[in-house]
């Protein structure tokens, strides 16, 4: 694990460069999205055992499958999630998330001793929750856009932002919930003092310039996405034509992100009033 602040350690998975966090203070620990592979979760458990600090709380930043594998290793530990989490794991997702995990486990030759059960939160919150961890005062803040139940974790003393699945150096914004909500979330975060940034996927940074750059680039991407897709809708273009209209938009790592960009365009097309089969286009079709 890498120590980023006197109270925060981060471990990075080999899957999607996923980050897991440990906030530690006065012998008390809070885990954030512990994962992903069994041996990586075990390493987190050993880290805490060596420090005599069993976890008291697990924060799940949102309900996507790659963020949900840790709690089963820590039975009895309090789980906190945003209030929309319960709806997000119900319905179709109640079957899809375990299926995604089974597919991932089979692909990587992981022998799971028991079927996956969706983590059930012991506490949920609406827009904000203050969480004490030793002497730390963490703020859990609703930050939708990527997911309806997404939340960030902010530690004001060190101005540390755990940004969930946003502000990556590798990924563009994955607008799998709502373009409007994502824009509002980034506007909110832009007003905060942030000296240490940890994305859900990718490299953490303590560079003021890098933090500002990621915020500005992602906000600019969303603004251009909105403008171009709105133009397509107003001109009566099809969703395929909207995708072509947005094909030359600039964004980071285009070779890796061309698929997510297309899904963003399709989902924005539906959100902004375009007519298409929502089961066949956008993030909902995955």
List each language-model region with its residue ranges.
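Active-site neighborhood of phospho(di)ester-bond hydrolases with catalytic His/Asp-centered motifs
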Residues: 32-35, 56-64, 80-83, 142-144, ...
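Active-site environment of divalent metal-dependent phosphoester hydrolases
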Residues: 37-39, 63-69, 86-89, 147-150, ...
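Divalent-metal (often Zn2+) His-rich catalytic cores of metallo-beta-lactamase-fold enzymes
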Residues: 74, 181-241, 245
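Core dinuclear metal-dependent hydrolase active-site scaffold
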Residues: 126-155
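Metal-dependent phosphodiesterase/nuclease catalytic metal-binding core
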Residues: 151-166, 181, 185-194
């Amino acid at each position: 694990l890498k120590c980023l602040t006197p109270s925060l350690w981060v471990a990075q998975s080999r899957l999607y460069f996923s980050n897991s966090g440990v906030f530690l203070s006065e012998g008390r620990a809070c885990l954030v999205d512990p994962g992903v592979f069994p041996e990586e979760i075990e390493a987190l458990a050993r880290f805490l055992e060596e420090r005599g600090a069993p976890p008291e709380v697990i924060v799940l930043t949102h309900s996507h499958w790659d963020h949900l594998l840790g709690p089963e290793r820590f039975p009895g530990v309090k789980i906190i999630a945003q209030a929309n989490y319960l709806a997000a794991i119900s319905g179709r997702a109640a079957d899809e998330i375990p299926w995604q995990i089974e597919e991932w486990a089979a692909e990587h030759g992981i022998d799971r001793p028991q079927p996956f059960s969706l983590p059930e939160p012991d506490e949920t919150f609406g827009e904000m929750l203050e969480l004490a961890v030793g002497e730390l005062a963490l703020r859990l803040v609703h930050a939708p856009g990527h997911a309806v139940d997404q939340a960030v974790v902010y530690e004001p003393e060190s101005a540390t932002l755990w940004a969930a699945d946003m502000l990556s150096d590798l990924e563009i914004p994955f607008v799998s919930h709502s373009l409007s909500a994502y824009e509002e979330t980034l506007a909110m975060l832009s007003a905060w003092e942030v000296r240490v940034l940890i994305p859900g996927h990718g490299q953490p940074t303590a560079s003021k310039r890098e933090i500002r750059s990621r915020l500005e680039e992602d906000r600019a991407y969303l603004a251009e996405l909105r403008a171009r897709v709105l133009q397509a809708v107003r001109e009566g273009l099809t969703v395929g034509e909207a995708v072509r209209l947005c094909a030359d938009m600039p964004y980071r790592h285009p070779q890796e992100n061309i698929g997510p960009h297309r899904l963003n365009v399709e989902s924005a097309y539906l959100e902004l009033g375009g007519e298409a089969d929502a089961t066949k286009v956008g993030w909902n079709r995955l």
